[in-house]
């Protein structure tokens, strides 16, 4: 996977939460994602490709956030692409039982995004948790 990271040079990385009592493979995916990023950044790691920079890593919101120690830190406006997200979600028939949950969640996160940003055009949003601190030259 280190070779793939170095080949792709991702600008952003998304992964599962650190904990998930219902999906034990999700924390393993998280661990593998984070370890691979570290190795792909390491100058001395023996793998092909250009050393990876420092793409930010975000944990996407699981459907049981309270049980996964998820803490929303970033609200992403998905209003312009919500219909595409909805079609993609509906293509996963095995998770039909979650469709309404995620529709409602996108609306709730949209309301929170409006409240936290003052941008009234936001109807739908997603929540993410940062893995590493944000580096900035000024507050925004």
Regions inferred by a protein language model and the residue ranges of each:
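Metal-dependent de-N-acetylase/amidase catalytic core
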Residues: 1-140
């Amino acid at each position: 996977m280190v070779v793939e990271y170095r080949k792709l040079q991702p600008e952003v990385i998304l992964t599962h939460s650190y904990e998930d009592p219902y999906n034990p493979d999700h924390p393993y995916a998280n661990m593998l994602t984070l370890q691979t990023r570290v190795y792909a950044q390491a100058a001395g790691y023996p793998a092909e490709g250009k050393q990876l920079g420092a793409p930010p890593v975000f944990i996407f919101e699981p459907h049981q956030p309270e049980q996964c120690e998820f803490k929303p830190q970033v609200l992403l406006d998905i209003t312009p692409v919500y219909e595409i997200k909805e079609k993609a979600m509906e293509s996963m028939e095995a998770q039909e039982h979650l469709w309404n949950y995620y529709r409602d969640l996108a609306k709730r996160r949209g309301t929170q995004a409006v409240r936290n940003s003052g941008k009234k055009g936001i109807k739908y949003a997603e929540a993410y948790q940062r893995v590493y601190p944000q580096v900035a030259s000024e507050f925004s």
